[in-house]
Amino acid sequence: MTGNILIKPSVQQKFDSVMQSGRILFFSAPCGFGKTALANALLCGHRTLRLCADAPDFTLRTLPENWDVLLIDDFQLLQEQETSQTLCELIRANPTRRFVFLSRGVPPSYLTAFQYTGLMTTLEPDDLLFDREDIRGFFAARKAAVTESEINGILKESIGYPLGGAVTARCMSGGKPFAPEIVAQAYREVFSYFEDAIYRRFDLPVRHFLLDLAPFERFDLEMARMVSGDPRTGNLLDWLLHNTTMLRYDDVRHFHFWPQFRAFLLWEMEKECSEEKRRAVFSRGALYYELKEDYAHALECYTKSGDHAKISELLIRNSELHPGMGHYSEMEKYYRALPESEILASPSLMQGMSMLCALAMDYEGSERWYGALKDFADCRKKQDPAARQARSRLAWLDISLPQRGVEGLIKTIPAVFRLLTDKEITLPSFSVTSTLPSIMNGGKDFSEWSKKDDLLYRTLRTPVEAVLKKDGVGLADCAVAESKFEKGENITKRILALIPQVSEIQQKGTPDIEFAVNGLLARCQLAKGQAADARRTIETLRARFEAQGLTRFLPNMDAMLCRMALHCDDPDSADEWYRTKAPRDPMHLNVMKRYQYLTQAMVEIEQSRPDAALLTLSPLERYIQGCGRHIDGIHLNILCAL
């Protein structure tokens, strides 16, 4: 702490390194990060020439001689090529002098060479954010007493933003406790500062562009163009990226606003935009998500736009997607908000409600909606397209509903196969794995079939592949291999025969079956003591799935990697998964996460926390019993016994 200025040790270290062996220290952060005050504190005792790029008489051509450090504030305003060339010549001609640049933008390309050679160090926003210790020291320097819980609250609300912390400290002067009124006052002051120091300095097209994008946490160029309707979208994004640090890259194609600035933009939007304007923005965003088949975000935006007709339309379309993708639980609130009369008029919505109730373990409600769908089909002529659709949905539910078990499937699947062959029904897609690394214990528990797996393989393979379509590619061979593995048989030859089918699964099948095949391979490798190979199998698949946007599989892949860590006596990796990715919400059971719940309990047992493990496992018992999940039941009973 220098005076009232907090200098983080990491910042001081980088400054000292530049003074000793570097040339340039570049501050790249939004306003309110204390760049000017911090630079002045660091440069105390150095002969410093201070210039401001927005000064009318700014020039680099004629500089006095008595300086060791040149500081240029508002560096982002240096746009002229002649000035940049002069600056580079000045830096190269003065190897014993140092340069400190304060910018709201990113380092310009003409300074890249200095960065690559290690002569330029950049301080970014994350380098300047306050952490818990910084906040404690900041308040202590102002002789303001704060409790640990208040420090946590200040850090949460300010996200470490220095101006937010400073304003909060001033608002709490005189011994005022940290309370919602203090938070509201601090936000108002910070937002007013943003309005004057940043927002009002932008041209009107930039302001409108920012407000159009503010409601969306993440966007790409295509979405920005569709939402704003501005043909210069690419140029505007490029200008914001180079002249501010308010817009950040998520990856090569996606962007997001710095969180505090986005909160300000939403505040500004409430003030400046009419209700009609805000609804129009959400409607355009919803259309983008709809075209990308991101129905969860589309429904959220259509709800905010007030377009209730589109909500019903999207839910009907969404019912084509299987629950293994998790869409039913994501959209539950939209289904529940529909009038019952509207649901009863749509076979798709009745199917969706039946499955939704089943996933919520409301089996009575699930069967009620199944009955309503059956009544819908029965009261119409057989040739009626609506009746045909209803029969198709009923056949889908007969196979998919978790409470139905597998006992009747030996008769159901051939019957459905005949209906398909006779073109009496068409089936939506299925989920045979529920994004789990297993077929035997995926969407349903097929352990009963293991007793006669060879017979069922011969008799049911053709109808199963026809009924399941893409999900049937590679399914039968993977399922029978997994059945043999679960019975303790050596399946090396079966695995060797299965692996060549992966390319066909990738081309003609589904990622669900590909994950099941890789999951079985990894379990075999683990059983043979090849832990490193098993981990590589899943990590390689995970990286490819993530690159392809198949994010629905990642949570169970991470849980599987955690189990491998436990198997290999790697508690640190298991603890990391537990802290950052475990569900850890026993009061809200999501049966689609059952693999993760069991993994969570394993980690809790490894941590010598049996009570926590029992609390995690307890909600699963009703689901396991109600849906005949024998394999999950064995795992649960073993974990409870431990």
Task: List PLM regions with ranges.
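Amphipathic alpha-helical "lid/sensor" segments that cap RecA-like P-loop NTPase cores
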Residues: 32, 39, 116, 121-122, ...
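Residue register of alpha-helical TPR repeats
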Residues: 212, 280, 313, 348, ...
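Alpha-helical sensor/transducer elements of the RecA-like P-loop NTPase core
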Residues: 11, 37, 85-153, 157, ...
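C-terminal boundary/linker of central alpha/beta nucleotide-binding cores
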Residues: 149, 191-271, 280
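Conserved P-loop NTPase "ATPase switch" module shared by AAA+ and STAND
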Residues: 63-83
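Internal alpha-solenoid helical repeat scaffolds
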Residues: 342-517, 524
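Walker A/P-loop nucleotide-binding motif
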Residues: 22-39
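Extended alpha-helical scaffolding segments used for macromolecular assembly and cargo binding
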Residues: 275-349, 356, 365-369
